[in-house]
Amino acid sequence: MKRSHLLSLFLIGCSLSASAQLSKPQVDLPDPLLMNDGTTRVENLADWTIRRQQIGEMIQHFGIGQKPEVSPEAIKARMVGDTLIVDVTVGTETLTLSSCIRYPNVGQPPYALMIGTSMLSLPKQLFESRPIAVMNYNEAQVNDYTQGRWRPRHERGEHNFDRLYPHLKDNGAYSEWAWGFSRLIDGLEQLGPEVTKIDVKRIGVSGCSYAGKMALFCGAFDDRVALTIAQEPGGGGAASWRYNCGVDSVENLDRTDYHWFLESMREQFHGDSVYLMPYDHHELCAMVCPRALLMLGNTDYRWLADEAAYVSLNAARKVWEKLGIADRIGYSINGDHGHCQLPESQFPEVEAFLDKFLLGKSDIDTNNILIAPDHFKKTIDLNKWIKF
């Protein structure tokens, strides 16, 4: 199994030169292109690879907890019919993941694959005429926390992940869910396209709401994902913690679900202390670079904090622009539809990203898919937040 492409991003014991909060408050967004030494700036993809690692370390250290690496020998994958089963063994403990792959009725294998975090919320008609397989990632097999009571759930430190990594019992769910997602891709790689009928170079991930956040973390922390579509991810996803500080009726750092994050994040960065945070979520978005990212918003739900996401995405776009690949990031923010109910008006943006980044149609134009309400553009001063 090829592992070099994972950049050794998230090894246990990786040093954190930015393991402390900022020495003084910074209201505007931290520069994603500035290295931890405070002087060196990213000039090319090689530099960005290093900077991306630094950002990933900060997000784990302060925000979600560690996403541990797994040796290839710990993975044992098999197909039972159309179901992918992956056993992950760490020490004496084994965790089993299973996900059914639904293959398209058009095209020839190996197929591109879109993985839905928890479930694929994008409308099925987007896939019916495209040679893209779909699969849902059952995150409860790793960490079964849910805000609702529609299924039994365990508390922090009691999940299946914690059997394998008891020393990481304080982790937030998003690090653990991202870990499990990566193990599914490990399984696909191990078996190969002859067995799975999947092209692992054309994998996408998408989810909505809490699962939109999950999709963003999964795509950011695994560079084998070609396309990330984060649908209505809200605060803790694409939205800037800084922008949301003190804003009423939105999900901000003081009003999020801390089963998802490290409790220490709230202790360190509550209230105005958020301005001491050495990163923000425009940098989580930027971690997807140089791959493709599309964010879908819904202004009908103020809790989703789309204004803050608008700021974050424009800030993150600076990284793609620096590398000359700004066609790989876009956003589409509108309203007049239900939560996680993608309207037909947003189909063209999604179709363009699917066709270009999963199906390889290079003639598709994804430049300047930057769709937001006019009042965002008129009332939000991007220069106040983006000074790099």
Set out the residue ranges of the language-model regions:
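Alpha/beta-hydrolase-fold serine-hydrolase catalytic core, especially in secreted/extracellular enzymes
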Residues: 21-98, 103-109, 289-291, 298-388
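Hydrophobic beta-strand anchors of alpha/beta hydrolase catalytic cores
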Residues: 112-114
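Alpha/beta-hydrolase-fold catalytic nucleophile elbow
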Residues: 206, 231-232, 296, 334
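Conserved hydrolase catalytic core segment
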Residues: 221-226
